[in-house]
């Protein structure tokens, strides 16, 4: 998604 950078 557009917030994939929040996946740790």
UniProtKB/Swiss-Prot annotation:
One GO term of the biological process aspect: neuropeptide signaling pathway
Gene Ontology cellular component annotations, sorted alphabetically: extracellular region
Disulfide-bonded cysteines: none
Swiss-Prot/TrEMBL keywords: Amidation, Neuropeptide, Secreted
Compartments reported by the entry: Secreted
Positions carrying Phenylalanine amide: 8
Stated family: Belongs to the FARP (FMRFamide related peptide) family.
Protein name: FMRFamide-7
Species whose genome carries this gene: Sarcophaga bullata
């Amino acid at each position: 998604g557009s917030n994939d950078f929040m996946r740790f």
